Amino acid sequence: MARVTVQDAVEKIGNRFDLVLVAARRARQIQSGGKDALVPEENDKVTVIALREIEEGLITNQILDVRERQEQQEQEAAEIQAVTAIAEGRR
């Protein structure tokens, strides 16, 4: 079992409350969103992986926001393509 000291992660994020929010958000992405870990998993739980990513500076709240916006734009573009294909098929 990995031991994680969160002091470095707190320094990267700014305060412990925001750290909890960012780590939880990232852990949910890894667990349910099908996102790959950016650090070796080493049989760690997703919360530990999220904290290690934050500690190494790979994940911040801003990075998560940008990634989510990009994914949303890609999904919207795919939906528009699908609707266009359906509409053209009906002509």
Swiss-Prot record:
Broad class of enzyme this protein falls into: transferase
Q: Which GO terms describe its biological process?
A: DNA-templated transcription
Q: One GO CC annotation, please?
A: DNA-directed RNA polymerase complex
Gene Ontology MF term list? DNA binding; DNA-directed RNA polymerase activity
**What residue ranges are annotated as transmembrane?**
none
Oligomer status and interactors: The RNAP catalytic core consists of 2 alpha, 1 beta, 1 beta' and 1 omega subunit. When a sigma factor is associated with the core the holoenzyme is formed, which can initiate transcription.
Protein name, entry field: DNA-directed RNA polymerase subunit omega
Q: Which organism is it from?
A: Yersinia enterocolitica serotype O:8 / biotype 1B (strain NCTC 13174 / 8081)
